Amino acid sequence: VLSMPRNLGFLEACPNPPFYLNLFLSVSKICNISFDNQNKIGINVLIAIIGGPNKGKSTLFNALTLGNAAVANYPFTTIDPNRGVAYASKNCPHVHLNRQCNPNNSKCEEGVRKIPINVLDVAGLVEGAHEGKGMGNQFLSDVAASDCIILLADASGSTDLDGNPCTPGSNDVLQDIEIIETELDAWYLDVFKRNALKARGKKIEDFANLLSGLKITMDDLNYVVRILELNPQDVWSWEKEDMKEASKIIRERTKPIVIAANKVDSEFAEKNVLKLKEFYGKRYGVFPIAADSELALRKANEKGMIKYNGKTFEITTPNLPSQLISALEKINKNIIEKWGSTGVQALLDHCVFTLLNQIVVYPVEDEVHFANHFGKVLPDAILLKNGSKSIDLAGKIHSDLATHKLHAVDAEKKMRIAKDAVLHDGQVVKIVSTK
């Protein structure tokens, strides 16, 4: 079973796969077979996929991670959160350096560096979740640790607000978003109220410490105090409406959202995507996606049946079964030709590089050969907040390196980097230290 030809893997995406495929998949899950044991240093971004029940969250998760999250056409298929690794993409500097890279904490495919990103697929959220309805309490706790949110809407309008199948086009896609927003804001307000009571009579720094589990910082609180002209000495004294507005602003600031309009190959998708863009485009951004098509293409690519670059594909295996060729032609016509791509990779890259404002920097020890001390060229791709300096890069690699840092060198220019200089995207940097 374990020596089953790899090109049969695409049959996973087909109905009624043969018994030996199911057996192979079962064995691989039980044995936890994995081909990715890389040491992912410097990678700490977490993206949460949220939405109502049965909107396609687990399919998107699987498409991003090539995971095996349960997928079914009924509510609350996901009970425990699924965790996995997806890969954001950036052009790798090895191309213009004319050196072959040797990635350690990432991958490189045809000149594109793939940087690992943590992804979380959580249980579907329904109205009343902040009061514990459905999987509400677990859902909101899972979201707390995330850095940004992909909010999934069903562009086909074929699932109701509770996740039950309904007549395509009958569900109002705007309500997919409104309910989630309402529940998030209600939950944040409740958290603020409870912790404001705990911080009664204390400094705002104490309030910030109580909210740190939501990745809320003192800078965030100072921001909201300033724009709403609130009293920083006593959070408990804030008026009810001020508390509500403050918690909403903090939620939007610390958990940026992008909307993914899923199932764009459906009859009503184009109308619903336009509707979402009209109401939410300026505020959140809306990405039309086809998660199931992305999953099928990635599995076919993994098995060597097609060559897929995240946008377009070409068939590389001769004599494919007619049903598979037909499925691929349908994806090409209904998704790629119409929408330009499945939208999934663009969605992930938007989260990392736009919503979270990250850049990629490549630390090396040998600035002549752009390598580490083992001679590996551009081994690590490190994500940093745009505006970071060399001391931030040193700390991301190891706290001791930051402590003993002397200076940094731009490996391409062979010039020392000023202490207060801001690093730029794609920069190759050597950190010089006393150790």
Regions found by a protein language model. Give the residues of each.
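Conserved G1/Walker A P-loop phosphate-binding module
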Residues: 35-133, 137-164, 169, 174-175, ...
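Short, charged beta-turn/beta-strand-edge "cap" motif at the junction between a beta-strand
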Residues: 433-435
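Short hydrophobic targeting helices and cationic amphipathic motifs
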Residues: 8-11, 20-25
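Canonical P-loop GTPase G-domain recognition
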Residues: 266-362
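Short acidic beta-strand-loop surface patches of small beta-rich interaction domains
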Residues: 406-422
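Short, contiguous acidic and Ser/Thr-rich linear segments
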Residues: 376-388
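Conserved C-terminal guanine-recognition region of P-loop GTPase G domains, centered on the G4
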Residues: 138-288, 294-296, 304
